[in-house]
Amino acid sequence: MTRSPAPSSPTHPRRLGLTGSIGAGKSTVARLLRERGLTVLDADAEARWVTEQPEVLTELNEAFPGVVTGGTLDRAGLAARVFSDPAQVARLNAITHPRVRARMEALEAAATARGEHWVVQDIPLLFEGGLERGMDAVLVVDAPLELRLERALARGGLTREDILARDARQLSSEEKRRRATIVLDNSGPLEALEGQLDAALRQLEIT
């Protein structure tokens, strides 16, 4: 499924959103985009950077006592505490999201200064956060559920039940596909994915 990209603002490069369900292969596509010379802003990496800053650690420990020990955030403990409680998630997001946005905007400004015409924003919960409205186009990486589960389990750290629970809290793959500008089907070999990606970049006039 494809649709035309929205017009971009003259104050920043065009924004290509990148998202996908757990195990779909979004990280692989992000790597391929970097190999093709595009700047990829990784929302998860920037969120990790933000939560390493002393003032943020202080706020997090005040909001969630005990999650910071010796200046280090217990990420697993924090995730377990907020995961099933929407009010706690909202509290965490209120601390981190404005800072992550500011960080992404600063990196985007640097890309603008380098004369780049497009930047990629790699955001796992792009649709769930309503962030597609700020994108000029959105790539959704998708694959069948069982294949996604197999890949996610191979990474380790999560059980099948954990993965299914996280997946259930996101928009369905079908809804993500419906909202996408272009869908990349990652159910085949890497070469097939690369071919689809290159075709998408040509369609969007990125390369």
UniProtKB/Swiss-Prot annotation:
InterPro entries per the UniProt record, alphabetical: Depp_CoAkinase, P-loop_NTPase
GO CC entries: cytoplasm
Pathway in which this enzyme or protein is active: Cofactor biosynthesis; coenzyme A biosynthesis; CoA from (R)-pantothenate: step 5/5
UniProtKB keywords: ATP-binding, Coenzyme A biosynthesis, Cytoplasm, Kinase, Nucleotide-binding, Transferase
EC number: 2.7.1.24
Coiled coil location: none
Keyword Cytoplasm listed: yes
Segments forming domain DPCK: 15-207
Compartments reported by the entry: Cytoplasm
Major subcellular site: cytoplasm
Segments of this protein annotated with the region Disordered: 1-21
Catalyzed chemical reaction(s): 3'-dephospho-CoA + ATP = ADP + CoA + H(+)
Domain of life: Bacteria
Record bears the keyword Kinase: yes
Xref: PROSITE patterns: DPCK
Binding site for ATP: G23, A24, G25, K26, S27, T28
GO biological process entries: coenzyme A biosynthetic process
Compositionally biased residues, Polar residues: 1-11
GO molecular function: ATP binding; dephospho-CoA kinase activity
Role this protein plays: Catalyzes the phosphorylation of the 3'-hydroxyl group of dephosphocoenzyme A to form coenzyme A.
HAMAP family in alphabetical order: Dephospho_CoA_kinase
Alphabetized PANTHER family for the sequence: BIFUNCTIONAL COENZYME A SYNTHASE-RELATED, DEPHOSPHO-COA KINASE-RELATED
Classification via NCBIfam families: dephospho-CoA kinase
Protein name stated in the entry: Dephospho-CoA kinase
Source organism phylogeny: Bacteria, Thermotogati, Deinococcota, Deinococci, Deinococcales
